[in-house]
């Protein structure tokens, strides 16, 4: 009897389990709250893995749309986080969070993940594994800045990066609702003249 084979991304530490992380108790801070006191919306300040574990039991299978903007792993160090991780560590960081995020989604829910080209290809394969390749909806290219030709205004002669991507996955593609039709493009000057 042969073992069922599948395509998957592997790396050192992939099989180390994070499910044993104890969920944390969230403490409400009224000084940061405003608006409708009966809303179910929450903002969690802290490590996102611990925050996800804290809400997992209450919100499993209940969130319709998730948007995340994870670290791009650009090789830089920022004030609030290190964006220079070894690729296997970055993949492990993403996988542990994506597994929880998938459990949080409703059956007709979608997740939207913004990323640049540094880890986009690896993230796509990882998401195929976590959400299922058949649940891939689309990859949207987002123009981040206008550049003047390949030189980007003349600072050097290499091609410039001017776009990022949003990977869109459904928890179950067959249950995902249809999108509204596209909006007609209107020039800003025409919009201003209307008012």
Model-derived features: positions:
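DnaQ-like (DEDDh/DEDDy) 3′-5′ exonuclease domain used for proofreading
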Residues: 1-67, 74-89, 93-96
């Amino acid at each position: 009897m042969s073992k069922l084979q599948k395509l998957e991304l592997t790396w050192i530490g992939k099989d180390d389990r994070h499910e044993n992380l104890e969920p944390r108790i969230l403490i409400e801070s009224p000084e940061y709250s405003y608006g409708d006191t009966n809303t179910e919306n929450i903002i969690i300040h802290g490590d996102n893995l611990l925050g996800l574990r804290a809400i997992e039991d209450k919100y499993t299978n209940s969130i319709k749309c998730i948007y995340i903007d994870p670290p791009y792993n650009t090789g830089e160090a920022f004030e609030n986080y290190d964006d220079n991780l070894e690729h296997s560590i970055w993949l492990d960081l993403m996988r542990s969070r994506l597994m929880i995020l998938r459990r949080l989604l409703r059956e007709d829910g979608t997740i939207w993940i913004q990323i640049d080209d540094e880890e986009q290809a690896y993230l796509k394969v990882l998401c195929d594994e976590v959400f299922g390749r058949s649940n891939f909806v689309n990859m949207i290219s987002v123009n981040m800045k206008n550049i003047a030709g390949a030189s980007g205004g003349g600072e050097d002669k290499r091609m410039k990066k001017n776009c990022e991507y949003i990977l869109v996955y459904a928890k179950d593609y067959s249950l995902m609702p249809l999108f509204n039709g596209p909006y007609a493009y209107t020039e800003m000057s025409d919009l201003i003249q209307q008012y």
